[in-house]
Amino acid sequence: MYLGFWLSRLCRGLSRPIGKTMRPIWGSLSRNLALSSQRIPEFSSFVARTNTCGELRSSHLGQEVTLCGWIQYRRQNTFLVLRDCHGLVQILIPQDESAASVRRILCEAPVESVVRVSGTVISRPPGQENPKMPTGEIEIKVKTAELLNACKKLPFEIKDFVKKTEALRLQYRYLDLRSFQMQYNLRLRSQMVMKMREYLCNLHGFVDIETPTLFKRTPGGAKEFLVPSREPGKFYSLPQSPQQFKQLLMVGGLDRYFQVARCYRDEGSRPDRQPEFTQIDIEMSFVEQTGIQRLVEGLLQYSWPGDKDPLVTPFPSMTFAEALATYGTDKPDTRFGMKIVDVSDVFRNTELRFLQDALAKPQGTVKAICVHDGAKYLRKEDIEFIRKFAVHHFSQEVLPIFLNAKKNWSSPFAKFIMEEERLELARSMEIQEEDIVLLTAGEHEKACSLLGKLRLECADLLEMRGAVLRDPAVFSFLWVVDFPLFLAKEESPTELESAHHPFTAPNSSDIHLLYTEPEKVRGQHYDLVLNGNEIGGGSVRIHDAQLQRYILETLLKEDVKLLSHLLQALDYGAPPHGGIALGLDRLVCLVTGAPSIRDVIAFPKSYRGQDLMSNAPDSVSPEELKPYHIHVLWPADSEEESASATPSKHLSS
């Protein structure tokens, strides 16, 4: 059933003869991806085959064909299924003595061996058709066969329903890529990128420009990979984004820039992050925030797969403050409710000391979420897990309140809740018989963040018990805007750091606060969120050199010498400009429903940042390091140096 599902998506639309005008082979994945005058790609041009395995139909009966592919499986030495990236076709193994050599090749070749066969397209015997297979009405009566390459014993079966560990899949990635799931993911990714390029360059005049991947270290942001140079003590860095280059392109008058950009971040072990990733990078001159948003909405509409429901634009928008107050996060999953409600007024006269203490503070508040049908799905141990989670991760207390079947309040704290408070809480939160209320108190941001986490934990628990909250077929986009421009540093709360990056322009109405209360300034930044995942972030940039220098030097205490090239460029008539970067890996992962971004990247790294197939990163000999004036200090060497009071370094030049 699973294989048939993917085959139908993979091979849909292949029944017409090649050369006629129609949707391309993968156009069945998207209503928007097919140009009205586009012809089917000639998949068999320039190669030693006449057809692909997935395109043959009853309309080809009697035709002589040559096919190349992998042996998917074989049954009773009577027939086998041949597979290529376009689909499957049944091959009838000849049984007569005159074709003994052909039979020997096809019967003795191991599964996943590569063969080329030639023969005639014939109908399957009545009753033996396979309606789940796009080529299920026909089979190939083979006349000649050639073993192109035999396959040795496989480390795992190449079938989507066969479970493999991720480590094994990454070690033998070239085999894992043969699966229909990976074929579908990568081809859909390719087609979405093609349509994005078409939308931006052909329809809206963007210029596709490659920017350098060898750059210099920049202040702030994520850690960067260093690349040694032949100058002693000097290093390049791999850019975490083309941010500075695309701004410089606007100074250079390119007006509209686009790139499928490779980016790099040395973030260590992150379960679902990659040290190298791809983003759709965009920058425009003379644009405001709404212009970028409308462009991106049109871009996604144009490139959206046709087997999904069409996108409705414009996407809804929400301020950062609203997102935090309602969902407890700046990237809310709006597919389900369970919104945060401020119930401070309900408990102004409460006898609960925990709530009294919170409300007595200037920023104190009481917040709650209602888990609809929670009593139906959640168990006692689930409630205990939620309470321990709050204490362990937030040092906060959570009060579970629920109604039993007789509509009597049942809670460890029930005796402290007055009748008026119960009725008002039930009214304000629209509590039903099987609902559970999770209530907490404290400083606004901390209380909201806690309930935002519990909201997702409860959704996980409910879905684990059989409830349906987050429909995977629903794609809920949301713009989040009006972020704070600066945040207090965790290690030094009196100092500021950029909430996103130091090139974001402040809201025009907040510029005066830069010189008096910079922590209150909002930035012209906007994030695009899909189903609780940030898939894009952008901003209107600072194009005034004096303002950029003030923010870097005075507010952020950064060394402006590192950005002297950018500051100098802004002094030479930089236009107003803004842009955005969309995370391609994350976007395709969500569109395909893949469990990890590693399932939509051809050759990803493991969660530890390693290439399990090639064993990268690898050691380098001292002779190879010599031109770079680098000497490696191994851990034992570092310990010895520490003992002798010499500062240890992993790299010395």
UniProtKB/Swiss-Prot annotation:
One Pfam annotation reads tRNA-synt_2
Provide the binding site for ATP.
R265, D266, E267, E534, G583, L584, D585, R586
Keyword annotations for this protein? Aminoacyl-tRNA synthetase, ATP-binding, Ligase, Membrane, Mitochondrion, Nucleotide-binding, Phosphoprotein, Protein biosynthesis, Transit peptide
Query: Which SUPFAM superfamilies does this UniProt record tie to the protein?
Result: Class II aaRS and biotin synthetases (SSF55681), GAD domain-like (SSF55261), Nucleic acid-binding proteins (SSF50249)
Q: What EC number(s) is this enzyme filed under?
A: 6.1.1.12
A GO CC annotation recorded here is:
mitochondrial membrane
Any idea which residues bear Phosphoserine here?
S241
Q: Which Gene3D superfamilies match?
A: Bira Bifunctional Protein, Domain 2 (3.30.930.10), GAD-like domain (3.30.1360.30), Nucleic acid-binding proteins (2.40.50.140)
Query: Which residue ranges are recorded for the region named Aspartate?
Result: 243-246
* Statement: the UniProt record of this protein carries the keyword Aminoacyl-tRNA synthetase: yes
List the catalytic activities from the record: tRNA(Asp) + L-aspartate + ATP = L-aspartyl-tRNA(Asp) + AMP + diphosphate
Q: Which GO terms describe its biological process?
A: mitochondrial asparaginyl-tRNA aminoacylation
> What CDD domains does the annotation carry?
AspRS_core, EcAspRS_like_N
Which GO molecular function annotation, any one, does this entry have?
aspartate-tRNA ligase activity
UniProt-listed InterPro entries: Aa-tRNA-synt_II, aa-tRNA-synth_II, aa-tRNA-synth_II/BPL/LPL, Asp-tRNA-ligase_1, Asp-tRNA-ligase_1_N, Asp/Asn-tRNA-synth_IIb, AspRS_core, GAD-like_sf
Residue numbers binding L-aspartate:
R265, R541
Q: Does the keyword Thylakoid apply?
A: no
Q: Where is the signal peptide?
A: none
Where along the chain is the transit peptide annotated? 1-46
Could you say which protein family the record assigns here? Belongs to the class-II aminoacyl-tRNA synthetase family. Type 1 subfamily.
The record describes its quaternary structure and partners as:
Homodimer.
Functional note: Catalyzes the attachment of aspartate to tRNA(Asp) in a two-step reaction: aspartate is first activated by ATP to form Asp-AMP and then transferred to the acceptor end of tRNA(Asp).
Put simply, this protein is called Aspartate--tRNA ligase, mitochondrial
Its lineage opens with: Eukaryota, Metazoa, Chordata, Craniata, Vertebrata
Q: Which gene encodes it?
A: Dars2
